[in-house]
């Protein structure tokens, strides 16, 4: 039905007759000539109909937005004065010779103009229309190019594309599982996989030493701009490769993607330890485009007569750190109060500040509500430590170390945006040497990555003796403050795996019930293995500049995990529930506060 895509027509086709199909993006009658913008997934081309062909002209005059049509015409060059540099096809136009309406369109429920706002609900309800918009179509086409490039790279490096089960067993991986009731085994449930983690390890044990899969994963968790209940991973696992080798190979893949698809040379990725990232940036996924860093000043303020500072400064678990913001002294008191309110979201109790209005005036040039607690020597030491100049602003975080890191790390990002401090377009890095475990709110231990991550150079006995001091052989790839992917060397010894389970409070009986198949498999010559999983949706979001992963997925869910297009989730009918042995129990209404007094 067509000879070319609309967006592919160019000057090399001048003088040729082409057949195109697509949708009417816009139609207008200017001085007795009909100009038609015809759109398909590759772009838009202008078609011109004039009255010299009255039958075709009359049909063209009836066209409206989103009519699906076929046109035949002659490619001709536009006059220089009419060239549109904003269009790929802007040097040419089609003189329409024939026109067939393949289907008309009802009045549109959403606005197709990119400059007009549609609600998220409208866009998802009429996603098939939303996806016709060029910016959305471009992202979906770009996504296909990324997955194609990934497959070419991995296939070319000896990786095998192997599918793993979607109906599997629930395992504790951090988020809630989506459960699927079994009709055959009443009262029992499959779980949709949060990742193929255990199956890809089993593939290593099976001798398939290089595996990959572009795979759907499912997590029933609260959603954010970069989270969806179902998402796609580029899942990779290897045997007989060290963590350094896995990092080198996957870095090569990502650098190749950016070079091929964006013509961007990312260069060699620097490496940074988890401890350094948290100390300098308050985050284990630092955005290195932002020049601001957290600067420790506990040693300077530990003797001041101000409990907000000297308390954390003298607490082994406390921290006092500052941000020095160039030009920040211009902020009003109201704006500073907004910053103080912002850090409370992250657990901070408040935010002290110091304006350097005029460095030459000494203490007279310093403005701060806590200045009365600070001697001139302390102020001078702070100025020297931070390198603050006239017009700068110093912001203080003082609390438990984890709260200071989280609150000041978040404030660092906000200030970087507010003051337009971001430098460069792409800043990748590897974050390595993560703690194996972290404390939970109830004092227990939680695996920072997952319970199958191997420690660096420790025996099971050493690990159980000092779990909180253990460093994992794990690595995260970070770009512009987003985690692109994370991985680790895996445990390949049953004794070490059992030790990790015990540290996490999983006794031998529970471990046998939930992971017995893994512990058994580890007994039969399991090779050393390591891997990594990338969030494909997040990679596409960054590469296309989209604001949400919903804008790079064909049919995403809302932030409440619903699909307005199909009205999913929906109720099952009683017959289906009976076959599954499932009954629906109405949730009990929450007790009124007065009823509990």
Curated annotation (Swiss-Prot):
CDD domains: AspRS_core, EcAspRS_like_N. Its EC number is 6.1.1.12. Keywords: Aminoacyl-tRNA synthetase, ATP-binding, Cytoplasm, Ligase, Nucleotide-binding, Protein biosynthesis. Residues 197-200 are annotated as: Aspartate. The keyword Disulfide bond does not apply. It catalyses: tRNA(Asp) + L-aspartate + ATP = L-aspartyl-tRNA(Asp) + AMP + diphosphate. It is found in: Cytoplasm. Pfam families: GAD (PF02938), tRNA-synt_2 (PF00152), tRNA_anti-codon (PF01336). Its main location: cytoplasm. InterPro entries: Aa-tRNA-synt_II (IPR004364), aa-tRNA-synth_II (IPR006195), aa-tRNA-synth_II/BPL/LPL (IPR045864), Asp-tRNA-ligase_1 (IPR004524), Asp-tRNA-ligase_1_N (IPR047089), Asp/Asn-tRNA-synth_IIb (IPR002312), AspRS_core (IPR047090), GAD-like_sf (IPR004115). L-aspartate binds at residues 173, 219, 449, 490. Homodimer. This is Aspartate--tRNA ligase. The gene is aspS.
